[in-house]
């Protein structure tokens, strides 16, 4: 069984890496380029994400958050070392007392453009950002960890999500798309700003109620878990939509939850 408290202990000397990421680089659209550059990119990114300790939280090895980054390279300028991609980012969480894993994040970043030369080493300092590729993966590392923590305690990811917002503000000087406020309502800035908007607290509460009080309870008492899920959907999801109609967070969440929700209510009219 996975220990809930291990996600919540700060400053532990045994703190370890939080993420177990799998990176996939789909470069089928690119011809005439040595595949080794894509292989090196994939290996560099997995080391960067998986070997770094992003917070002071204590995660056992078997508690690391499984996540996937599927990058599709649309253009590659080998003279300038610029990759123009879109990225599908997904993160999962185990459900207590079961073999089932549930998705906690699934979204496409259409502005995943960066510079990378083969054998580059990624350096990262969130206060003085000067590397777009490191900033992209740090952003999603903080976002995923913060969302995961929200599923284990109400607003539990606040500190980590604030770090994600701080990084986003510091990334404004990077000359790449996706970081600017008001560019569109689905870019990286818009997503993290919405998570931290007080009007979206019902959406954050939904994460705890749905996963911890709902799914985690279903192995012991399916009806009680289902009731918790119904209540939070009717109250918190509805309230989040009313509070901020232009936010895409509820729609993104509903899109990747629709199949799971159908299974939860299967045979229940």
Report the location of each language-model feature:
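Second-shell loop/turn segments in exported
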Residues: 28-35, 123-131, 243
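Alpha-helical segments in soluble extracytoplasmic regions
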Residues: 170-236
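A cross-kingdom marker for long, charged
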Residues: 24, 211-269
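Bacterial Sec-dependent N-terminal signal peptides
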Residues: 1-19
């Amino acid at each position: 069984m996975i220990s809930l408290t291990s996600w919540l202990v700060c400053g532990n000397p045994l703190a370890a890496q939080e993420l177990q990421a799998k990176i996939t680089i789909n470069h089928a659209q690119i011809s005439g380029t040595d595949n080794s550059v894509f292989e090196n990119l994939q290996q560099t990114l997995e080391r960067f994400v998986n070997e770094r300790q992003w917070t002071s939280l204590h995660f056992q090895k078997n508690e690391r958050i499984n996540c996937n980054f599927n990058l599709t390279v649309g253009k590659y300028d080998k003279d300038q070392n610029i990759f123009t991609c879109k990225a599908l980012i997904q993160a999962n969480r185990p459900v207590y007392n079961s073999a089932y894993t549930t998705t906690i994040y699934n979204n496409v970043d259409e502005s995943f453009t960066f510079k990378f030369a083969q054998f580059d080493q990624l350096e990262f300092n969130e206060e003085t950002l000067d590397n777009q590729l490191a900033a992209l993966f740090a952003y999603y590392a903080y976002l995923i960890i913060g969302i995961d923590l929200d599923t284990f305690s109400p607003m539990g990811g606040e500190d980590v999500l604030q770090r994600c917002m701080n990084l986003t503000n510091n990334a404004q000087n990077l000359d790449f798309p996706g970081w600017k406020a008001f560019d569109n309502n689905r870019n990286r800035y818009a997503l993290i700003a919405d998570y931290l908007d007080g009007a979206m607290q019902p959406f954050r509460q939904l994460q705890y109620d749905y996963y911890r009080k709902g799914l985690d309870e279903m192995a012991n008492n399916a009806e009680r878990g289902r009731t918790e899920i119904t209540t939070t959907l009717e109250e918190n999801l509805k309230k989040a939509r009313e509070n901020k109609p232009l936010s895409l967070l509820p729609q993104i969440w509903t899109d990747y939850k629709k199949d799971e929700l159908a299974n939860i209510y299967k045979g229940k009219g």
